UniProtKB/Swiss-Prot annotation:
NCBIfam families: PRK00504.1, PRK00595.1, rpmG_bact. It comes from the Bacteria. GO terms for cellular component: cytoplasm; ribonucleoprotein complex; ribosome. This is Large ribosomal subunit protein bL33. Belongs to the bacterial ribosomal protein bL33 family. PROSITE patterns: RIBOSOMAL_L33 (PS00582). InterPro entries: Ribosomal_bL33 (IPR001705), Ribosomal_bL33_CS (IPR018264), Ribosomal_bL33_sf (IPR038584), Ribosomal_zn-bd (IPR011332). The lineage of its organism: Bacteria, Pseudomonadati, Acidobacteriota, Terriglobia, Terriglobales. The gene is rpmG. Keywords: Ribonucleoprotein, Ribosomal protein. Pfam families: Ribosomal_L33. GO terms for biological process: translation. GO terms for molecular function: structural constituent of ribosome. SUPFAM superfamilies: Zn-binding ribosomal proteins.
Length: 50
């Protein structure tokens, strides 16, 4: 199965807030989204971590 579960980590507080799936065959780079962080209480950049 090519899809793998990944975690998204806040760029400011380093808290792992979100989890999602990713197809590693078609998306080789790291994902980055602008998401709401409950700890920071604002929209921040969330990057993929293992």
């Amino acid at each position: 199965m090519p899809r793998e579960i990944i975690q998204l980590q806040c760029g400011d507080c380093k808290d792992k807030n979100y989890s999602t799936t990713k197809n590693k065959k078609t998306t080789t780079g790291r994902l980055e989204f602008s998401k709401f962080c409950r700890k920071c209480r604002k929209h921040t950049s969330h990057k993929e971590v293992k």
